[in-house]
Structures are given as C-alpha cells and as structure tokens.
Swiss-Prot record:
E.C. no: 1.97.1.12
Residues given in the record as chlorophyll a' binding sites: 676
Family: Belongs to the PsaA/PsaB family.
SUPFAM superfamilies: Photosystem I subunits PsaA/PsaB (SSF81558)
The keyword Oxidoreductase is annotated on this UniProt entry: yes
Assembly mode: The PsaA/B heterodimer binds the P700 chlorophyll special pair and subsequent electron acceptors. PSI consists of a core antenna complex that captures photons, and an electron transfer chain that converts photonic excitation into a charge separation. The eukaryotic PSI reaction center is composed of at least 11 subunits.
Top EC class, one word: oxidoreductase
HAMAP family linked to this entry: PSI_PsaA
Binding site for phylloquinone: 693
Residue numbers binding [4Fe-4S] cluster: 575, 584
Name of the molecule in the record: Photosystem I P700 chlorophyll a apoprotein A1
Length: 751
C-alpha cells in the first residue's frame, strides 16, 4: 500500500527561526520615541511625553508585521520574568538578611513574621514594632514565611542560596529575551502553532511542574515539616540533600520507603499511604491542609496534565486538531458554530490575551476564596493579617485582569476583527443579538440594584423609627440564604457517601468542629444569615454592572446606532466631533475607564464583607470551649443597615489607623492620610474640563513670557482621554492605599 507523505510532511511541526534578524543597537535607546514616526521628531508640546508613555508598548500601533509584533511580545515576556525573578530574589534576600525567620520557625503561632528593619535616621525606627522573642521590625503579611516552612527551608543559608539562584534565573531570562529577538527569533508559524503550545504548557509547565513540586514535597519538604511538628529544633534537622542520599532518614519518617519502588510496579500503591494521604480537612497542629494530602494532590494533578499534554495533534498520529474541535462545535446546525475562532486566536494576540486574562482573573478570585477556607501553608490560618492581605491581594489582581480582558477584547474588535471572515459564526451571532443581551443585562442590574439597596433603605428607615420588629434580620423578618445553606450542608453531610475514605470534608467552613491552635481559631463553621443574603445581592448588583459596562464596550466597539463608523475612530477617542454633541465617552477605552470604577466598587464591598464577617464570626479565641470572636458576632445584627456598615465597620474599625500616630503603626496613619489626598486629587482630573486648564496654562505662560523664561516645549493641557486616565489611576491608587492602611492597622492591632 503506497502512502503519500507529501501533504503529511507539510503538516509536520518544525521549529524555524531567523538567525540574526535584528542587530543589537544601543544608540536607539538614547532617542526617545524611536519606535514612532511622529514621536521620534521630539517634543514640541508637553503632550509628547504623555503620548510617549501611552504608546510605548502599543506594538501593533506602529507596526503591521505580525511576526515582528509576536517576537517583541515574546521577548518582553522574558524581560517580565527576569524582573519577577529579581523581585523574588529580593524577597528571599530580605528573609535571609533582615528577618526573624529562624525565631518564627521555633514558635510560628506566637511570633509574628518580620523581614524589614527600618534604619534610625531621624526617628523612623519607631516603625520597628515588637513582633515577639525580642525582635523589632516591620510585620510583613505576604505569607512568605509560611511558604518557606511548607517548602522545607529551615535556615538563612538556604534563603541566601535561593536568592542567588533567583538572580541567576533573572540573568538567564534577560539573556533569553535578547537571544530570541536579536540572535534566533522564531518565525510566525511557531507562534501560531497552538497544538504544540498547549501540549508543552499542559505536560511541561503544569504536568512536570506539579510532578516536580510533589517530588520536592515528598523527599524534602514533608520530612522536614514532620520533624518541625515533633518539636525538633530547626538547627538539628538534617540538610535537604541528606534526605536524598541517606535512605534511613526517610525510612524513620515514612516506613514505606524501605520497600522502594516495588509497590509502584506491583500496583500495590496503598503501601505509599503514609506519605500520599487522603485525609481531608485541616491538620489540627498547623491549621493548614495536610501536606501529605497536598503532595498526593500534586501527584494526581501531574498525571492528569501529562496525559492532557497529549491531547492535541502535532507530528504523531494521536490527538486532535484544535481547528477541527472548534469547527465541529455546531449546535443543532443553526449556525457555523465556532468556525473562524481558530483563525481569530492564532492571528489576534489581543483576542488570545483577552481570553487568558479573563481565565487568570477568575482563577485569582477562586484562589482568594480557597486560601482562607482551605489554608495551604502551616500556621498561615492563625496569622489573620496575612489572611486578610492575601484575600484582598488576590481579589484586586482578579479584578484588574478581568477588566483587562474587556480592554483587549475591545482592541481585538476594533483592530483585528474582520466581519467578512466571521459571517454567521458564534461571534457574529452574539454581535447580532447585542441589543437583546445588553438590554436584558441592564434590566438585571436595575432589578438587583433597586431591590438590594431597597432592603437596606427599608432597614435603615425602620431602625431610625425604632421599629426593629419590622426589619429584615435573623431576629425579625428573616431572609435566610437557603441555597447557600443547602450547599454548605451537602458539602458537610455527604462526605461519608461521596468520599468514604476521607475523615473530614474539604474545609471546616462547611460545618463540623472548630480548628484552633493554642486557643486561636484557624477555621470553623461559617454561619450565613440575613445580613449575608443582603450583601451578597449587593455583590451580584455591582458585578453585573461591571460586566454590563465591559460587555457593552466590547459589543459596541466597532459601531452603534449613535456612531455607525466607530471602528474608524479607533480604540480610544474623546468624542465623534467636532459638531456632534452627545457622542463623548463612547469609545471602547471609555468603557474600560468606567469599568475600572465599578470593579473598584465591586471589590471594595467584597473585601469589606470578608474582613468584617471573619472578624465577627470566625477569627478569635477558644477558652474552655467558650468562643470569643474579635467583634463578638456583631455582623448579623449590624450589617443589615447602611448605617451599621458605616458605624460598626468603617468608623469603629478605623480607630486603630486614626490613632496610630506615635506607634509602630504610624506609617499606616500617614498612608491613610496621604492616600485620601491622592484619591481626592483624582477628582480634580475627573470633574473639570480640558478648557479650564488650557485657559489657566495660557495665563501662566503669559507671565513666563513677561519674565522671558518661557519654556521651549509649549505647555498643553491634558487631552480629555489623558485626563481621565490620570484621574482613574489616582482614584484607584488612593482607594487601594486607603483600604490597605485601614485594614492592616486594624488587623495587626487585634491579631
């Protein structure tokens, strides 16, 4: 049987590069704006510097060569990784040089982590608070100490070594970024080979990465943690490599190591259940997930992802073509299904980035919610300041990524979308139905907003009139979250039937016993009531409004009834003018601008809810079976009115930051004050128009001309878009700084 291999060979994946495509030239670095024909002419007005910052990374704004754009993005990724490695190296160096890590290891439940000691130049050493065991420094809330313990680091030398390793990796990343742009740059077809990319990312990054971490945990981290849990001093624990070369060290901790690989090859895997466990719940000694459960999880994940890395067809006869999967997705044959989407994601990096940002942002929010209910690192659950910081951090990261997804989806629609190539496919049909989608989503927002705020306004009114029996509360008119309670109940009750070998559910948050360390609550069942029901509908309202703004921006980014030729105006433009009133703030960029404010609204309420709820109903102490929470359970009684949120959360809990002056928390008081100023400063840009500032500038320039000190670069007021960008940046920076200082001063004081 003859086989024609000519076409098959054409389909083979080849790694193709251009050698020495772009010479290394440092002279261009000295010429700001060299990448743009207009900017390279130099500044005539002050607008030039703003345009320089706005456009410097807009690779496809000054080039239409997709291959060159792809190479620049690829190279920039290595640069980003290099910066991350330097940052991480700095964290580890601080841990080695300036921290109380070894003291913290000896008593992590009582001693607070610190890795920064402020120098006494003119009294700044007031910031060095007593974190325990005689160490004075700034308390940190990054969770790094807990990660280091979980990974088996026991001394400063190991931290130093890792810091040096981080710098070596940073150098390799910077070198790779230069090498793959200037010396051996991949061709476009390499960037567009989705199957190979997915296979390598699934098997390599996720599969082998998880396998490596599982191996590290089993052979090094868990044995060291077992010894620490038994009270062995960190200085007496064998060095990591000793567990690898001396088998008796491992056999003393895990007897199954004596049997070697025999149980593996004879499929008698249960023999390994001493280090690959399936216990569920939290370790009562450390308040974290069982490290042996985590190792088991990573081993299972590794197997799944290594298999998943063989799903997509490349040079071998197994797997599927992504294009065929997408084009085969025809539902009831009413449309072309997903045809055209493969071409979109392999030619528009904005479309691909949008999808990735939406997924990564959602994942970050999922991480935030898992990390407090299922704390992964030893003793992190009783470090309330770290728990609050990490929840807030992951929520913010998720919010910014999701807004970024909307931004890049809009850029794709404006710059990369071709209607002729997408006729009657999934995307086209969504665009055709955009009026129905947006109008219904708008109705949902109005419904949620009016009803959820209506409940609060009713309660505030009844409270003011002294009619507490007519309020929505757990003690009067109840609005119990029955569906949430049902989900909690089944997660707690059905463990015996769904996972008979597990001793506990995934988290005590579902129900069961309190997990406490030295009398301090790590996690316990979280009761939900009327106040939770009410604020959850505020969450639903703000999230839906954020989605409405971003989705409207995407679906109407090319055209609308108001501006049919919007795609010709680009991603960002102030108005469709001059001469057309009522067409301002309709660009896709403006939707991102507005979406950022609503994202801020959404997340502020989420992190406020989290902070108050856990202080009220979870965090605290257990003494002789008597549970005492930080705010003594006042969430249920107070969080059902707007006045309650203002009085018993914002005002009551801000006392620590307001009264922090003269203490080690005084920096938070100054940040609280300064961040309020930054936030207020933003309103100057958001409320006033460009003309006001241009008139003012011209008066100031007139005065300079009189004194013959007029600048060569003519001052110009910010454009409308630039003003909004500066405004939203300061609004968010001020808001985040205010919240950060408010949270930390409060939680460090009561932790």
């Amino acid at each position: 049987m003859a086989i024609d291999v000519s076409n098959q060979n054409d389909d083979l994946v080849k790694v193709v590069v251009d050698v020495d495509p772009v010479p290394t030239d440092f002279e261009r670095w000295a010429k700001p704006g060299h990448f743009s024909r207009s900017l390279s002419k130099g500044p005539l007005t002050t607008t030039w510097i703003w345009n320089l910052h706005a456009d410097v990374h807009d690779f496809d704004g000054y080039s239409t060569n997709l291959q060159d754009i792809s190479r620049k993005i690829f190279s920039a990724h290595f640069g980003q990784l290099g910066i991350i490695f330097i940052w991480l190296s700095g964290m580890y160096f601080h841990g080695a040089r300036f921290s109380n890590y070894e003291a913290w290891l000896s008593n992590p439940a009582k001693i607070k982590p610190s890795a920064q000691v402020v120098w006494p130049i003119v009294g700044q050493d007031i910031l060095n608070g007593d974190v325990g065991d005689g160490f004075r420094g700034v308390q940190i809330t990054s969770g790094l100490f807990h990660v280091w313990r979980a990974s088996g680091i026991t001394n400063e030398l190991e931290l130093f070594s890792t810091a040096i390793g981080g710098l070596v990796m940073a150098f390799l990343m910077f070198f790779a970024g230069w090498f793959h742009y200037h010396k051996a740059a991949p061709k476009l077809q390499w960037f567009q080979n989705a199957e190979s990319m997915l296979n390598h990312h699934l098997s390599g990054l996720l599969g082998l990465g998880s396998l490596s971490w599982a191996g590290h945990q089993i052979h090094i981290a868990i044995p060291i943690n077992k010894l620490l849990d038994k009270g062995v001093s960190a200085s007496e624990i064998p060095l990591p490599h000793e567990f690898l070369v001396d088998k008796t060290q491992m056999i003393n901790i895990f007897p199954s190591f004596e049997k070697g690989l025999t149980p593996f090859f004879t499929l008698n895997w249960k023999e390994y259940s001493d280090f690959l466990t399936f216990q569920g719940g939290l370790d009562p000694q450390t308040g974290s997930l069982w490290l042996t459960d985590i190792a088991h999880h990573h081993l299972a994940i590794a197997v799944l992802f290594i298999v998943a890395g063989h799903m997509y067809k490349t040079n071998w006869s197994i797997g599927h073509r992504l294009k065929e999967i997408l084009e085969g997705h025809k539902v009831l044959s009413v449309s072309k299904g997903h045809s055209g989407l493969y071409e979109i994601f392999t030619t528009s990096w904005h479309a691909q980035l949008s999808l990735n940002l939406a997924m990564l942002g959602s994942l970050s929010i999922i991480v935030a919610h898992h990390m407090y209910a299922m704390p992964p690192y030893p003793y992190i659950s009783v470090d309330y300041a770290t728990q609050l910081s990490l929840f807030t951090h992951h929520m913010w990261i998720g919010g910014f990524c999701i807004v970024g997804a909307g931004a890049h989806a809009s850029i794709f629609m404006v710059r990369d979308y071709n209607p002729a190539d997408n006729y009657n496919n999934l995307l086209d049909r969504i665009i055709c139905q955009r009026d129905a989608i947006i109008s219904h989503l708008n109705w949902a927002c109005i419904f949620l907003g009016l009803h959820s705020f209506g409940l609060y306004i009713h309660n505030d009114t009844m409270s003011a009139l002294g009619r507490s029996d007519d309020m929505f509360s757990d003690t009067a008119i109840q609005l119990q979250p029955i569906f949430s309670q049902f989900i909690q109940r089944i997660h707690y009750m059905t463990i015996e039937s769904t996972a008979p070998y597990v001793s506990h559910g995934t988290s005590p948050a579902w129900g069961g016993d309190i997990v406490a360390i030295n009398g301090k609550i790590a996690m316990m069942p979280i009761s939900l009531g009327t106040s939770d029901f009410m604020v959850h509908h505020i969450h639903a309202f703000t999230i839906h409004v954020t989605v409405l703004i971003l989705l409207k921006g995407v679906l109407f980014s090319r055209n609308s009834r108001l501006i049919p030729d919007k795609s010709n105006l680009g991603f960002r433009f102030p108005c469709d003018g001059p001469g057309r009133g009522g067409t301002c703030q309709v660009s896709a960029w403006d939707h991102v601008f507005l979406g950022l404010f609503w994202m801020y609204n959404s997340l502020s309420i989420v992190i406020f809810h989290f902070s108050w709820k856990l202080q009220s109903d979870v965090w605290g102490n257990v003494n002789s079976s008597v549970v005492s929470h930080i705010t003594r359970g006042n969430f249920a009684q107070s969080a059902n009115t707007i006045n309650g949120w203002l009085r018993d959360f914002l005002w009551s809990q801000s006392s620590q930051v307001i009264q922090s002056y003269g203490s080690s928390l005084s920096a938070y008081g100054l940040i609280f004050l300064g961040a309020h100023f930054v936030w207020a400063f933003s309103l100057m840009f958001l409320f006033s128009g460009r003309g006001y500032w241009q008139e003012l500038i011209e008066s100031i320039v007139w005065a300079h001309n009189k004194l013959k000190v007029a600048p060569a670069i003519a001052p110009r007021a910010l454009s409308i878009t630039q003003g909004r960008a500066v405004g939203v940046a300061h609004y968010l920076l001020g808001g985040i700084g205010t919240t950060w200082s408010f949270f930390l001063a409060r939680i460090i004081s009561v932790n």
